[in-house]
């Protein structure tokens, strides 16, 4: 299993989650747009998995969905869902530094799962692993 492929970083080996920064803001030099891909088991009986993909921007959640972002971050143990998400993220910066927005995007991606993301492929576990590695090599 490769830990980096074409600037995609493996962030969670269980679902084969890879993350790649797709945009760096000019204001403050923060990375806040990320592409994410991973696989999940969709049918334990047939051992079928699906690969799904999304592009997320932290600013979208900070501007219009602050309460929802607080709930998402709280569900991963990063604060209280009654807190303002900016305060939660500020505390997270102490732990994650420059990677804080990547971690926030990972939380959003995992929270919504394939419900919000685009399903790219369905197949066996090995076929999905190969698909993800190929996707990362070519994108």
For each of these PLM feature ranges, what is it?
Residues 1-4, 130-139:
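Short intrinsically disordered terminal tails
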Residues 19-123:
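Acidic, low-complexity, intrinsically disordered interaction modules
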Residues 6-8, 24, 126:
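Intrinsically disordered and other compositionally biased segments
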Residues 2-20:
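Extreme N-terminal leader/activation tails
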Residues 123, 127-130:
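Short, charged alpha-helical segments
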């Amino acid at each position: 299993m490769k830990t980096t492929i074409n600037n995609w970083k493996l962030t969670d080996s269980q679902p084969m989650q890879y993350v790649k920064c797709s945009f760096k803001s000019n204001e403050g030099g923060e990375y806040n747009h990320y592409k994410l891909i991973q696989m999940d088991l969709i049918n334990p009986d047939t051992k079928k998995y699906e690969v799904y993909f999304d592009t997320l921007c932290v600013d979208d959640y900070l501007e219009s969905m602050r309460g929802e972002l607080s709930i998402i971050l709280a569900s991963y143990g990063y604060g209280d869902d009654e807190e303002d998400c900016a305060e939660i993220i500020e505390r997270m910066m102490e732990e994650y530094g420059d990677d804080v927005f990547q971690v926030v995007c990972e939380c959003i991606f995992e929270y919504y799962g394939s419900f919000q993301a685009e399903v790219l492929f369905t197949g066996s576990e090995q076929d999905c692993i190969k698909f993800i590695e190929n996707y990362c090599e070519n994108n």
